[in-house]
């Protein structure tokens, strides 16, 4: 019986596709197929509470389940799916994912996080696996330990602290270029204006100094990667290996990108070895040559750090700029704080108890990089809000439900109010704030990301005052306004910059 169930799971996507090809000619036919498949999936993946009540959740959707909804429409779906209760189930293709929304369930799930496994390719299918499936953030067990041990030293708190002067210089140069190329007052699209800073700041940390030609090549590789992610986000048959034969042009683009991306890293490695540099790429690629890391583990992890996190870093930084522009009293207080610490700026940026640090934290709270966390599973059975979830079942955290939880954050949880952190014990944030992940698999780049955000904001405010353009409705400054073309909520707002007659430092 177990063998039959396993076989059914293996062939299920193919059966669904073949049946759908014959029947999917109307909305009624689609509804019938989705309803039947939902019932079958529920039977194959039973989850009940102590009274025998089955877990609820949205109906399976053709081929993709709720995968695209999670990535592209997460904030809206968070609201829509509230009706299913504090714990519910969605589908990634035909793979079940249990969604948890309460801090107590987050704690219950993560208590054994050191034994958790990330879902294969984030349950996103074949094409996603070709791009990122072997990256550090999506592998588990001894492989994860091996890859993380290679990249962790370069992103540890001590290592990042030593890079403070370089990050500050990069931020200053970026802002200076922005200032020189514009008039005394101008308006920019926030995400577009800041995107290249975190990208090239991270690239410099990985590779050391790059020539202008190399920087242009790297940016172009990033754009090609984003194009491939566009195919991932279109879903459908890109979820399955059959896409290799159905979409030859896209697959050729994929193969060309992967070849060029590996070639770029190998060339930079040889160049840096030749001049005696000891940048992270030298150590990482040496492990590839020695056979300690596979080529896929290396280039997928580098893709994760640079390309996948480009949208994440751009989103975080652009929302920080927007919130400062929309909350001018807070901006004024930050400006005063920077002026007071103008003789110890590196020490100031390293602190976690400043208003600037709280602005970064509040931005990450209000705008987590994704509405639903990367799926992971515990080998142990879990009881989540009364439902018994079998071991090795994918679980995701509804990050907005945690970060906007009125029981912890108060009635004005949706308001940008960084001073709220003055009175909150940081230990209390452990299961009440989702920023860079939770448990032992917390994002490796958290220290670097926070440092980039602080230095960029500091240098930007040194040269400019920020405002929401007067023709824009300020009442909409904190409403949903994001791009739908990326897998994280990139801001789609404008900010007005006014040059200061005199800098703060």
Curated annotation (Swiss-Prot):
Sites carrying sugar chains = 316, 392
UniProt-annotated binding residues for heme: 443
A GO molecular function term, named singly, is: heme binding
In terms of InterPro entries, this protein maps to: Cyt_P450, Cyt_P450_CS, Cyt_P450_E_grp-I, Cyt_P450_sf
Q: What class of enzyme is it?
A: oxidoreductase
Q: By its UniProt entry, which CDD domains does this protein fall under? A: CYP_GliC-like (cd20615)
Induction comment from the UniProt entry of this chain: Expression is positively regulated by the thioclapurine cluster-specific transcription factor tcpZ.
> What cofactor is needed?
heme
Specify the pathway: Secondary metabolite biosynthesis
Q: What is its EC number?
A: 1.-.-.-
Source superkingdom: Eukaryota
Which range is the signal sequence, renumbered to this chain? 1-26
Q: List the SUPFAM superfamilies hit by this protein, alphabetically.
A: Cytochrome P450
Keywords attached to this entry = Glycoprotein, Heme, Iron, Metal-binding, Monooxygenase, Oxidoreductase, Signal
Q: Which family does it belong to?
A: Belongs to the cytochrome P450 family.
Task: Identify the PANTHER family for this entry.
Answer: CYTOCHROME P450 307A1-RELATED, HEME-BINDING MONOOXYGENASE FAMILY
Please give the function described in this protein's UniProt entry: Cytochrome P450 monooxygenase; part of the gene cluster that mediates the biosynthesis of an unusual class of epipolythiodioxopiperazines (ETPs) lacking the reactive thiol group important for toxicity. Firstly, L-tyrosine is prenylated by tcpD, before undergoing condensation with L-glycine in a reaction catalyzed by the NRPS tcpP leading to the diketopiperazine (DKP) backbone. Afterwards the alpha-carbon of tyrosine is oxidized by the cytochrome P450 tcpC to form a hydroxyl group.
**Protein name (database record):** Cytochrome P450 monooxygenase tcpC
